[in-house]
């Protein structure tokens, strides 16, 4: 079960822009991530590689934690991610991440957001 302090450390890492590093430090080796109803990606190395590939496609990303809740081994985070692509186009995703933790690391995470929002 994560402590509030541990969750706050994770959030701070993401907000600082260290997305791949946060996965390396805060996810179990066998962790999974799932986008809406898509098939989950499994394995921390796979998750890190995917995150790095996403970040290579953008000029910048701003990550904001709107709210977070810890309830035992379950965590909910409302994130807002604002992307600026190399083309200059932008996109904003307001999403909820539901996480299941094992001890002080994330084991399973699922993101819920509106996938139909095009880049501005």
At which residue positions do the language-model features occur?
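Basic/polar N-terminal segments that are highly enriched at the extreme N-terminus
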Residues: 1-5, 118-120
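Short, cysteine-centered beta-strand-loop-beta hairpins and adjacent loop/turn segments enriched
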Residues: 57, 83-92
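A solvent-exposed, acidic/Ser-Thr-rich amphipathic alpha-helical stretch
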Residues: 5, 18-72
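Hydrophobic/aromatic beta-strand elements that line small-molecule binding cavities or substrate pockets
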Residues: 51, 63-69, 80-81, 94-100
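Hydrophobic alpha-helical core bundles mediating ligand binding, dimerization, or RNAP-core interactions
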Residues: 7, 11-14, 27, 51, ...
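Short beta-strand edge/turn micro-motifs at domain boundaries
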Residues: 94-117
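Residue-level signal for tight coil/turn positions that link beta-strands
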Residues: 72-74, 103
